[in-house]
Amino acid sequence: MKNNQCSKVGKVNFPKHTGININMMPFIMGDINSIPKEYRCYKDIINSCNIHSSEIGKIGYLTITESFVNKGKPQRRGGIHTEKTPTHSWGGDDGGAWGGKSGLFMASNISDSCQIWNYHVDVPGLGGDCSHLRDKLGKGIKMSSNELYWMTDSCPHESLELKNDCVRQFFRLVTSDVGVWYEKHSTKNKLGVNPGCKIIKENKFKNAS
């Protein structure tokens, strides 16, 4: 494991929540018109990602989750994991701190709802699982509200149980180095922008690979 796998990018402001729920929707990075109008309210956060020039014009993947979450429940996938799996990349890892060419960006409007560790996991478990590393990772970094973070797809993180009932807004932008796109678990772009990788139609958790 090595560090320099995550860092703060800067403050962001979330738009008024409207119940958006999209996952890994493909769009053309640098072209806001490739994103359906109802999601363009996140334009300022997308621009804050300061995507590397080598990624402009390539396919990126947008996730926005706006939902009510009960106290004591995580909004998203629980357990420590990486975005990459043993067989597929999920944003890439150029091995350096923010300013690199690949990786992914995340933000939330609720503090302490996600925890990240500034480490590189060479070989995660099935589905990116890193629960076996919990004792070795030590204290993580709890993400602050309205703060944009960059990380590689080798950076372990977990969605945390929320301290109070709330409406949580979650934003993620994954850059182009994605190995596969799971059709059953992802959102198609109604403007016709297709994934820039292999499309898998089966359940992604079938083999958790």
Feature annotation, model-predicted:
Residues 1-59:
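N-terminal auxiliary "cap/dimerization" subdomain that precedes the catalytic jelly-roll/cupin core
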Residues 38-97:
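Hydrophobic alpha-helical segments and helix pairs
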Residues 130-208:
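Catalytic core of Fe(II)/2-oxoglutarate
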Residues 73-145, 181-185:
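Catalytic core of non-heme Fe(II) oxygenases with the double-stranded beta-helix
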Residues 11, 103, 168:
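A residue-level signal for beta-strand positions that form part of recognition/binding surfaces
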Residues 65-67, 83-85, 107-110, 152-154, ...:
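Structured loops at beta-to-helix junctions and adjacent beta-edge loops in soluble globular domains
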